[in-house]
Amino acid sequence: ATRKIDMAWLGGFTFVQASLRTRGTAVPLVQRAEDARFTSKFITASEGIKGFADLKGKTFAFGAPSSTSGHLIPRYFLGQEGINPDRDFKNTAFSGAHDATVAFVQAGKVDAGVLNASVWDKLVEQKKVDTTKVRVFATTPPYFDYNWTVRGDLDPKLQARLRDAFLKLDAANPAHKEIMALQRASKFIPTKAENYKGIESAAQAAGLLK
């Protein structure tokens, strides 16, 4: 909105916020294929938690307040399951980061938490979480998440070149492999603002848009 940034990597919720602040002019160019069907994982180290009903009266950790996958979508999904975090949890914490949420749960600081599936998979792969203690007990339905967004007044030709550069990235190409690995992307695909209307509706329902 202040024209200080030409391009940014945004989560679904932060894109919605950017879109509203720029009066709908921000343009989402591309997203990872994984972001077209993103999910969040609910985790616990408590044997007594088998489902959402068991969360009532328990302590719970979200990620950052502005996180799509660590707060907004999980909060909305909890509401769909009849759980009001502000009313039903004994205490609600914001860890600030997905890996911190796992650390909170593993250390027993909270009874349960939620994080994005990509980070969970990475931590499991890197053996940075003890899966004999911490387990996934629920997964959200899929939703659109991260994207690369540009200012709406950026030269359309430059927008097209940027989009094409992402779409040409190939994980099988050694020259592209490191970039793709850093983004944990199998490939990039085009996206559009309409894909994030569901997130905007969820944010409004959760009272997170002012």
Language model regions located:
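Short, glycine-/small- and polar/acidic-enriched structural segments
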Residues: 1-49, 117
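Sec/Tat-exported extracytoplasmic proteins
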Residues: 4, 9-12, 19-22, 46, ...
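Generic beta-strand structural signal
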Residues: 40-41, 56-60
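An extracytoplasmic/periplasmic, membrane-proximal ligand-sensing/linker region
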Residues: 149-210
